[in-house]
Amino acid sequence: PGPSSPPRRRARAAWWVGGAVLAVVAVVVVALVVGLSGGGGTPAVEDPPVAAGPPGTEFPPGTVRIVDEEAGISYPFLGNGWFEYDLGLMPETRTVAGQYFTTQEGVPTGGDFIAQCTSGPVADGYGWAGPGSEQATVTALADSVRAAYYPFPNERQVLRDEALTVDGAAAHLVEFQLTWDVEGYESTGERAALVVIDVGRPDPALVYVSIPNTHAELYGVIDRVVADIAVL
């Protein structure tokens, strides 16, 4: 695919226009409830602040985790400046839950460029054949997102390609760095990570984190999210 391919996570997922039925994603958000007595708990780890961008749908005050009931997992809410993902479906998953913020408005191919941390049950067509196929599935998904959501041409450097255990479940992680030099984009690269988890359901869960290098100070959220995924 060349520069005319669909823009990076375009608002409202324009490729689904034309009769596709959007799934209604029920995202259950866990709120931190402060007790009436002795409210001094251990403070949450704070990530670097996110530069102000166009506002999206804010999470309820006190949110600490995002619970994706459809995928069967939960993971950390990354804090102020991250908004509820409401930009439409992605073809890699049956439904989408998660968080994002805009890093550049009006990229050359249309739509906006974003940082995101999203999840969902993996859709058909990505090689899932049950337990033991985590690596094949996440590899196919990594190729899919590279082709669909980033400027071309680009170069990919694989940083990690390894089996994991996530909350007792078999999983596989692929993390990579993309670089490009494409006119009209403020970023010249991106760090992305995908984790496929066998959650004991017909479809495995996908967690997808992607941060443009204009916000490289946030690369650490990848390790934070991967280390704190829970299986429901």
Regions from the PLM with identified roles:
Residues 54-232:
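Solvent-exposed, non-transmembrane segments of extracytoplasmic/periplasmic domains
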Residues 1-55:
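Hydrophobic single-pass membrane-targeting/anchoring helices
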